[in-house]
Amino acid sequence: MEFTSKSENPHFSEVWDLDPKEIQSKTAELTLIDVRRPDEFVGELGHIPGSTLLTLDQLPAKLDTLSKDDTIVFVCRSGARSAQATSFALENGFNDVYNMRGGMLLWNEYGLKIEK
């Protein structure tokens, strides 16, 4: 996996961001976790086909359901909540975890495929 950049948010300097176009071309190789609310997941911005909804507030209780062997990309609306999720996973022993830069806003701006 090529890194796009370190997170631009100084509070998450240990988090690597991946560009939506890079993610779109590798969705079969990735575990995509959407940390938005259920209404956002099916709302106007839709969600990435094949992604799994696991809200940010559920993450602490359900992190152990994710495999540390998988490459995980966290997704949200703009990239802020997913950066929090990525940071939390890193703090809890996950190594191959990333944040989708720009969230679903940028995904939609690029015109990439969504489901609602």
Regions inferred by a protein language model and the residue ranges of each:
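Short, surface-exposed ligand- or partner-binding patches at beta-edge/loop junctions that are enriched
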Residues: 75
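Rhodanese-like catalytic fold shared by cysteine-dependent sulfurtransferases
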Residues: 1-31, 38-71, 80-116
